[in-house]
Design a protein with these regions (language model features):
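Residues at structural and domain junctions
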Residues: 9, 22-23, 55, 73
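Peptidyl-prolyl cis-trans isomerase
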Residues: 23-64
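Short glycine-enriched loop/turn motifs at secondary-structure junctions
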Residues: 5-7, 18, 47
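Short, amphipathic alpha-helical interaction segments embedded in low-complexity terminal/linker regions
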Residues: 14-18, 35-36, 75
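Short N-terminal micro-motifs specific to bacterial/archaeal maturation
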Residues: 3, 11-14, 27, 56
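Proteostasis/folding factors centered on peptidyl-prolyl cis-trans isomerases
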Residues: 1-11, 39-40, 64-93
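Solvent-exposed, amphipathic alpha-helical segments
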Residues: 19-26, 68, 72
Length: 93
């Protein structure tokens, strides 16, 4: 059996596309992802750790999230918000 590919990522979860786009704008302007996660994320587990999700396999997350996260270059973040059943995500690899 082959090794399962895993990815380390962070995310910021918000309730609107507009808010997610605002966060992406702040990142484009040089804001630190971890700081924005602490300020904005609706994910309680991400508030105190900069949105850190640790390592996960593609099958551990909903497809919309995994597809976007696994497509990122290391250190990059999504330039468009990612919609899932939980809300809108900004993801950083």
């Amino acid at each position: 059996m082959g090794k399962v590919e895993e990815l380390h990522a962070r995310h910021i979860l918000v309730d609107s596309e507009e808010k997610a786009r605002e966060i992406i704008g702040k990142l484009d302007g040089g804001a630190k992802f971890e700081d924005l996660a602490g300020e904005y994320t609706a994910d309680p587990s991400g508030k105190g750790n900069g949105g850190d999700l640790g390592y996960f396999a593609k099958t551990d997350m909903v497809p919309e999230f995994s597809d976007a996260a696994f497509a990122l270059e290391t250190g990059a973040y999504t330039k468009d918000p990612v919609k899932s059943q939980f809300g809108w995500h900004v993801i950083k690899s």
